[in-house]
Amino acid sequence: MKVSEFYQKFSSDCTAGSASQVLTRNEVSVDVTGRCYYRLSHGGENYALLFTNQIDSTFSDGSLSVANDVGGTWELHSVRVGICSRKPDGSYTEPELFHTLTFNGKTTRTVSGSEPFCTDPFPLHAKAGDSICYEISLTGACYPYHQEIVLPTFRLADGEWIPFKQFPVPVMIGSDREVSLRVGFIGDSITQGCGTEVDSYTHWVARIAAGLPDAYSVWDLGIGYARGYDAATDKGWLARAKMCDIVNVCFGVNDLLRGRTADQIIADLYTIVNSIHKAGKRVILFTVPPFDIMGEAQTYWYRVNAKIRGVLGETADAVFDFASVLGQPAPNEYRSVYEPHPNAAGCQIAADAYLAKKFF
């Protein structure tokens, strides 16, 4: 199936952030079989998975991977998906039935280059709240993975499944259920939900999704360490966000921490908003979240947020004042009441405030 067809027929049915964050840098090819578990938001009859071999945004200091880096050539031997159940101890049952997925009719694929790719549709007949086990087997030296994924991930080693993150994961779990609105959230670890417990789905994007009509789909494109200036390059990551009808944009923290000035951040946000509008989509622009930012960066934090609340925000379709919702009272507005990466309590408060605005 072509990616263009994927976007026509499929929309996100999982609110967990799942991305291409870092490239492995193995000296020689390695064999890996990995598993990751996802919870489905609404269920559906047919599904397909979307992948990319290109890094979405710069990881940490950039020494391992920067935005738009492309993975090497690697062999994808198999991808399987099956419905399973989460046990009280947090582990998962073995799926009774695994579906072996295909890529243009073939069960294997040689992956190379920067173009996204997807599986063919497969029947799943899933219900809302069902969990799925995603399993991939591959051989390669340089391929993407999600280091800060907030989902349970494992590798098969000597017959045992051990915690492990270094294997590719889908950037969307797509369902062909009928939806009336596609809502996307692009941002950093705060958007991804890195301050919440693994596999809890208590991050604010998930809590917003829970309060929206069932006919809406929600796609969390948040990634740890992400920068607005990477999204402003207008490559694969922002291109995915622009497949949504409404794009929520939440950047600034990592830009400030990496030395970006207020004027640079403002210019990047203008670029992002304009690009989304050129695609014919709506934008909800967030103020820069509260964080433990000191020195000159703190001054820039106030300047950028003043601009977002003013003329910059006027270029968007709406503004959500995230900073005011989670920030401390003056003079410490730049610090969060609910930890720098919002915990579950803070995420629920943010979600409630967002839903109360009735943006759409």
Feature locations, PLM:
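N-terminal secretory targeting modules
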Residues: M1-I186, T191-Q192, T196-V198
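Conserved acidic residues
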Residues: D130, D245, D317
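Conserved SGNH/GDSL esterase-like catalytic core that processes O-acyl groups on lipids
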Residues: S180-T271, D292-Y302, S336-P342
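Alpha/beta-hydrolase-fold catalytic nucleophile elbow
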Residues: C250, F286-T287
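Hydrophobic positions in alpha-helices of CheY-like receiver
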Residues: I272-I276
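A short helix->loop->beta-strand "cap" motif at the edges of active sites that frequently abuts
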Residues: A279-V283
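Catalytic His-Asp segment of secreted/periplasmic serine-dependent ester chemistry enzymes
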Residues: P290-F360
